[in-house]
A protein has these predicted regions:
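Short, amphipathic alpha-helical "lid/cap" segments that border enzyme active or binding sites
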Residues: 21, 119-127
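RNA pseudouridine synthases
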Residues: 27, 43-47
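Short, charged, intrinsically disordered terminal tails
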Residues: 128-135
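Conserved phosphate-donor/acceptor-positioning beta-strand/loop module used by diverse small-molecule
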Residues: 46-69, 76-85
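Short, polar loop motifs at secondary-structure junctions
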Residues: 37-42
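ATP-dependent small-molecule kinase phosphotransfer cores
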Residues: 1-32
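Small-molecule kinase domains that catalyze NTP-dependent phosphoryl transfer to phosphate-bearing small molecules
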Residues: 75-120
Length: 135
């Protein structure tokens, strides 16, 4: 997909994806874990006890969040431009490796607007959801 071709004819990006997928599966087989991104919903699609959440927010809420975490500037871009570029990269990566559409609600157990709820309430809702389904 991306990048130069490695020794086995696969791109370095494809090799990295496969290596990450293997590590994610190994960790998930050993113990409960939380994986953020890396197409983990797809990588772990055959794991029966997994939960998939998509955390999102408006661009304005996300800018406030990153600015509250300190100085945030990528390659001299504004926070909005950096977020838009990052979203485009995430979408392209996810869509390519999963064959699904990044952020589409029917791929997840739950989509949460953390911009409206805040981080703490979002975590509370996720924990409540997981705990209820584990019973």
């Amino acid at each position: 997909m991306f990048g130069s071709v490695g020794l086995n004819g696969m791109s370095l990006t494809d090799q990295l994806y496969l290596a990450q997928a293997n590590v994610i599966r190994e960790i998930a087989e050993d113990a409960p874990c939380v994986v953020v991104g890396r197409c983990a919903d797809h990588v772990l699609r055959d794991f029966p006890n997994k939960f998939d959440f998509f955390i999102h927010g408006s661009i304005e809420d996300r800018i406030k969040r990153i600015q509250s975490c300190g100085d945030y500037e990528i390659e001299g871009k504004t926070p909005q431009a950096a977020l838009e570029k990052m979203d485009k990269q995430r979408s392209t990566y996810y869509n390519y490796y999963t064959g699904k559409v990044w952020g589409k609600c029917d791929h997840y157990d739950m989509c949460i607007n953390a911009g409206r709820l805040g981080v703490e309430h979002s975590v509370d809702i996720i924990l409540e959801y997981v705990n209820r389904l584990k019973k």
